[in-house]
């Protein structure tokens, strides 16, 4: 079973041509997994994430605006990533989930310019997204202490997940629209 609880607080203020919008979401997740045939694999995981966002807007004139924004998104690991069951169908290539995974946190900063008139509109933006704790699958050679029940798999390939990934993405977006007449748009 999975239960998600959240609360959001936001604030908006306008000062002449400037607008500032800031918010924060607190999110708690409680996950409990039970296995009827293997109760020793039962586990529970709790997450608590604080997810901020902020936007600064400058209204250049009635039809033009510049906006700078930041937001965070979270991606909770799915049950397959968390499941501690050892899949040993192929005894030389073992898979096991990791119930200790954290939520993946994606941070995005974007700068946007937009202009709208009756004849045309243009929207240009530059964005940068980074993740410092991405959930990634990795493979190693099993090498457990002899006291660990998993030591029977020593020497086999061991596949599992951890928050070890780092991702970066840059995006440039340009949208335009031109309406030379009321019935024709490009």
What are these regions (language model features)?
Residues 1, 102, 117, 121-185:
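Outer membrane beta-barrel strand-and-loop segments of large Gram-negative receptors
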Residues 2-4, 47-50, 72, 94, ...:
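Active-site-proximal structural scaffolding
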Residues 3-40, 47-53, 57, 62-108, 128-155, 159, 178, ...:
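Surface-exposed extracellular loop regions of Gram-negative outer-membrane beta-barrel proteins
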Residues 22-28, 66-72, 115, 124-130, ...:
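Transmembrane beta-barrel strands of outer-membrane/channel proteins
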Residues 13-17, 72, 115-119:
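A generic beta-sheet turn/junction motif
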Residues 7-13, 54-58, 101, 111-115, ...:
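Residues on the lipid-exposed face of transmembrane beta-strands in outer-membrane beta-barrel proteins
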């Amino acid at each position: 079973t999975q239960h998600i609880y959240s609360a959001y607080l936001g604030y908006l203020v306008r000062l002449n041509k400037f607008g500032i919008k800031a918010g924060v979401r607190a999110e708690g997740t409680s996950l409990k997994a039970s296995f009827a045939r293997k109760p020793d694999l039962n586990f529970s995981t709790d997450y608590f994430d604080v997810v901020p966002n902020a936007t600064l807007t400058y209204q250049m004139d009635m039809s033009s605006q510049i906006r700078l924004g930041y937001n965070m998104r979270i991606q909770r690991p799915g049950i397959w990533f968390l499941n501690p069951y050892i899949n040993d169908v192929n005894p030389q290539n073992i898979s096991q989930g990791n119930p200790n995974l954290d939520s993946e946190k994606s941070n995005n900063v974007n700068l946007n310019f937009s202009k709208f008139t009756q004849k045309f509109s243009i929207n240009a933006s530059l964005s940068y997204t980074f993740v410092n704790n991405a959930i990634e699958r990795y493979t190693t050679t099993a090498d457990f202490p002899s006291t660990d029940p998993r030591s029977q798999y020593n020497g086999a390939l061991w596949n599992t997940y951890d928050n070890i990934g780092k991702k970066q993405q840059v995006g440039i977006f340009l949208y335009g629209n031109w309406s030379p007449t009321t019935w024709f748009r490009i």
